[in-house]
Design a protein with these regions (language model features):
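Extracytoplasmic/secreted envelope proteins and their assembly/folding machinery
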Residues: 33-40, 74-77, 111-119, 140-144
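Surface-exposed patches in mature extracellular/periplasmic domains of secreted proteins
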Residues: 48-53, 87-92, 126-134, 154-160
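A glycine-rich, coil/turn loop motif that links secondary-structure elements
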Residues: 129-137, 163-170
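Active-site nucleophilic cysteine motif
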Residues: 134-149
Length: 173
């Protein structure tokens, strides 16, 4: 027998703060999207969880990792460079992200950037379990990527995203 759907319980509106991204390796900035896609795929075959995106300067940039210190990120990048997996790299610091800048400019600044980043992925196909712009995203993979590109470390799966978020009453939307 099938049970009737249960209503989603309302969680108390306790304020939550998402974890911030740490230091990230950027291993490419390309004029051609195909080059970024190839590097991303190569990095992902190494289990690095890379993604690419189109930056405001028009270049397609490839990023991966989430390190506690710049030294850890640099050491990992140098190892990958020595192994011939990446060539040039740049370490993205937490203060470079919109989430940190939003402390100065306010939450509307962050919201606007999240929407702009998500719009940059319009046209990328839906793929169940997908987490990349080259093959496709599922809903939680897209949201995770958009948040990470803005400096907020959101879990991969929708259940974790739900738990990381803050309940908002329908009337407050």
């Amino acid at each position: 027998s099938c049970a009737a759907p249960q209503p989603v319980s309302e969680r108390p509106g306790s304020a939550k703060t998402l974890a911030m991204m740490g230091f990230v390796i950027q291993a490419g900035a390309f004029a051609q999207v195909d080059n970024a896609a190839r590097l991303t795929e190569r990095l992902n075959t190494q289990g690095l969880g890379a993604t690419y995106f189109k930056a405001s300067d028009g270049l397609f940039k490839v990023r991966f990792g989430n390190f506690l210190s710049k030294d850890q990120a640099r050491a990992r990048a140098l190892t990958l460079q020595k192994d011939g997996i990446i060539q040039d790299f740049y370490i993205v610091a937490p203060e470079d992200y919109v989430a940190i800048q939003g402390r100065r400019y306010g939450t509307d600044y962050i919201r606007t950037s999240l929407v702009k980043t998500a719009r940059d992925f319009i046209g990328v196909p839906y793929l169940w379990g997908g987490t990349s712009a080259e093959k496709g995203f599922d809903c939680s993979g897209l949201i995770m990527t958009v948040y990470q590109l803005n400096g907020l470390d959101l879990p991969r799966h929708s259940a974790g995203q739900y738990e990381a978020g803050q309940f908002v009453n329908r009337n407050d939307l």
